[in-house]
Amino acid sequence: PAEWAAHPQGREVAARPLLSRERLDEAPPRRRTGPLRVLDLTRVIAGPVATRTLALLGADVLRIDPPGSPELPDQHADTDVGKRTAALDLERPSDRRTFDELLDSADVLVTGYRPGALDRFRLDRPGLVTARLSAWGDYGPWGGRRGFDSLVQVATGIGVTEGSPREPGALPAQALDHGTGYLLAAAVLRSLTEQDREGGTRLVRLALAQTGHWLTHALPRYEPERYLTESQGPLGRLRHALSPVSYEGGPSSWSRPPGLAGADAPAWASQA
C-alpha cells in the first residue's frame, strides 16, 4: 500500500473523488415516455454488473458484443440477468447503421473499454447519459492503460494486505469489479434525475483503482446466505446473489433470467 501511495498514479487517484459526474452542454431535458433504454458496451464484471442493476430497476438493457467474441459463459449467466444480448460488428457499414440507430434512441450508454478505445465510433449524442468505466482512470501516467480487477488489487496494495510473507494474495471475490458496478449504476441514476430536471448531456466516470482506494478502509463482516437466491431459465438452475438495490414497492429480482448469449435481435424490447 505504501508503494502505491507514493506512485504517481496512486497520488493521482488519492487526489480525486471516488467518481465524477459532469454536465457537458445545454441540451434540453429528455421527455421519456417508455422504459429507460440502456445500450451496454461492457464486458466481464464491473460494467455488466452496473447494467444488470439498471435492468433490475426496469430499464430496457441491450448488450452489444462483437461477433465471435461472446462473453465467458459463467459471466454471461451471472451478469446478463434481465438483459437482452446481440452481436454487431461496428466496422461493417450495415451493422454500424443499426448501432447508430440504437444509440440515437438510447437514454444511457455504458462503456467498459480503456479510455479512448471507442472514440473513433463517435458515441456522443445530445442529452445522452454516458457512463465510462476504466481500470486506472483517464488521468495520470497510467490513464490510457488496460487493466482488470486482479491487476488493480495487486497494484494498489490489496495483494500485499491479503497475502503472506511468501506471496501476494487476493480478495475472495472481484470486489473492485462488483463495487464499481454498483457505484456506476447509482451514478447513472443520479445523472438521469439531473438530466430530467435540468437537461444537459451527462458524463459519469469511474475507475477500479478509485474503488480500490475506497475499499481499503475497514468494512463490516456479514453472513452471505441471506443475500443468495436461485432462479430457473434457459441456462438451467442458477444460484446467485440478490440485488443490493432494494426499496419498499421495488422489484425483488430481475424480470428475466439470462438467455442464450447473442440470441436476441439488435432492437429495443418494444420493437423486437
Please provide the spans of the model-predicted regions.
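Hydrophobic alpha-helical scaffolding
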Residues: 89, 108, 141, 145-148, ...
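Glycine/threonine-rich flexible loop motifs
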Residues: 96-97, 113-124, 140-142
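Flexible glycine/proline-enriched surface loops and loop-helix/loop-strand junctions
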Residues: 166-174
